[in-house]
Each structure stands twice: as C-alpha cells, then as structure tokens.
Amino acid sequence: ADEVAMLDSQIRRYNAEGSLNMQLVVNEPNAFGRSLMAHYGKFRNVTNYIALTGPKSNDTEAKLGYYGEKIVLEAQKAGLNTCWVGLSFSKKNTSIDIPDGNKLYALIAIGHGAESGATHRIKTPQQISDDYATAPDWFKRGVDYALLAPTALNQQKFHFQWLGDNRVKASRGIGFFTKMDLGIACCHFELGAGIPIYWQ
C-alpha cells in the first residue's frame, strides 16, 4: 500500500508538471499476455504498470521519457524493479482510460524482480558528445549519467552539446522510441550535472 501511494503521488506530481496523463494500474494481468515477461525473465507475474499516456503532440514522447524515468528512479529507491516496455504489450487488453486527444505510448512494468538487471554495453562519452573533453565537469558528469540511462534496444541514439553557461543542446538520432529515450537521457543528465540545465 505504501508503494502504491508513493507511485500515485509521483504520477500526480509529474502529470501536473508535464501536462501528461500517466496512470498507475495495479493487479491487472492482461496487458502483457503470456509472452513478454516469459521472454525477458525479469519479473514474476507482472500485473502492475504505469501507462504512459499523454496528448498527441510532438513533444509528448520526450516528456513521458523524462518524467517517467523520474518515477522509475523513485520506484527503484523503494526497492521495486522496473522495465520500460515499448512494443511487447497488448494495447487492447490494458485497462486504462485514454481521454480524447491522448494516446498510449508505452508502459513501465513494475514489480519485485526475480533478479537484478544486468549492465548493458554502452557507448563512450566521446561518442555522444563532441564537447566532452573541453566542457566543464558538471557537463561531463551529465554525459556520464546519461550513458547509464535505459534505452530501447540499448541503442543510445542521443547527443549532447555544451553551448556555454548552463545551456545544453540535446538531440536524437533516427529509430524506434528515440524521442522517449532522449527524455530519459535528459533526466539522467540533470541528475549527474547537479545544476539547473537550460535545454536548447
């Protein structure tokens, strides 16, 4: 109950900040069918998830990535395991309310994992930032943290450029879920930098 209350509180907060419509669904076994978690082997009996819903607009996916990852990090602090799920779920079997003008973009599965997640191969800092060698320490920390962010298929198709002062340009490559991945990476970048970032 405490975990549900914590997640509900986080979701309400970030929905308000981001003008989103994320929803927590508990004890609902149908969204994943039989295939997803059997393939990944990460959770036992997943019936809880956050539905990442928001307006049909260009910036929604990045915002869902950014705010969704904030919730993920809080959930992990509370001892929960999480998994971003972009494709392997059944939209028709989810029991969520999608308002007019909104769309379901992805889910975050939440549960008590059978095992801890593994570390995946990552790019080097220089591969995602041409400014890494000459930028301030806070920027380097941001890049280092961004490389720890989960991305679809571990593709890490994002790039950070230091523009002087606290200004940073974040851009993405082409591919599935790169908008959401960029939002997740920006969340990690801010954590690493430890200072307010003015995104350009």
Please place each PLM-identified region on the residue numbering.
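Acidic, surface-exposed loops and disordered segments
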Residues: A1-Q200
